Amino acid sequence: MQKKVTIYTDGACSGNPGKGGWGALLMFGSVKRELSGYSPATTNNRMELMAAIQALEALKEPCEVALYSDSSYLVNAINKGWLKRWTSNNWKTAAKKPVENIDLWKMILELIRLHSVTFHKVKGHSDNEFNNRCDYLATQAIKNNR
């Protein structure tokens, strides 16, 4: 039986593009682990994806994951089938344009094959303490350049 892990993620960017940070909170039972990182030149969407990637990569074995994000870009790509269509269309959007952030989407595809992941949308900058913590981690990563 797989471990059940809850993950919250967030990305932030100072300017878009600009300096970016991401934060993640992993919870298994009473154990909590915080992760964060920084990029000197990026976009908000890349940081949202990177938060999910780094959180899923931190898992040491296949897990059942509930991943919560305030990123419509991330959650809708999975839940509305955009990612499947992009891969079927040779990484082209419905408008026949190249999909942005292909490198990161390919990493997410690999990770969701390893784990059983459900993606959930949460409202950003509201009263969700876990999402707010991830936002804090992401903005601190930008502030501290790490």
UniProtKB/Swiss-Prot annotation:
Superkingdom, taxonomy of origin: Bacteria
Record GO biological process: DNA replication, removal of RNA primer
Record carries keyword Magnesium: yes
Residue pairs linked by disulfide bridges in the UniProt entry: none
Matching Gene3D superfamilies: Ribonuclease H-like superfamily/Ribonuclease H
Main location, first listed in the record: cytoplasm
Catalytic activity line of the entry: Endonucleolytic cleavage to 5'-phosphomonoester
Cell compartments where the protein resides: Cytoplasm
Cofactor requirements of the protein: Mg(2+)
GO cellular component term, pick one: cytoplasm
Alphabetical UniProt keywords: Cytoplasm, Endonuclease, Hydrolase, Magnesium, Metal-binding, Nuclease
Annotated Mg(2+) 2 binding sites: D10, D135
UniProt-listed SUPFAM superfamilies: Ribonuclease H-like
A GO MF label: RNA-DNA hybrid ribonuclease activity
InterPro entries in alphabetical order: RNase_H, RNaseH-like_sf, RNaseH_domain, RNaseH_sf, RNaseHI
EC number(s) from the headed UniProt entry: 3.1.26.4
Cofactor: binding comment: Binds 1 Mg(2+) ion per subunit. May bind a second metal ion at a regulatory site, or after substrate binding.
Residues involved in Mg(2+) 1 binding: D10, E48, D70
Location of the RNase H type-1 domain: 1-143
Disulfide bond is among the record's keywords: no
Biological function: Endonuclease that specifically degrades the RNA of RNA-DNA hybrids.
Family: Belongs to the RNase H family.
PANTHER family: RIBONUCLEASE H1
Subunit composition and interactions: Monomer.
Designated name of the protein: Ribonuclease H
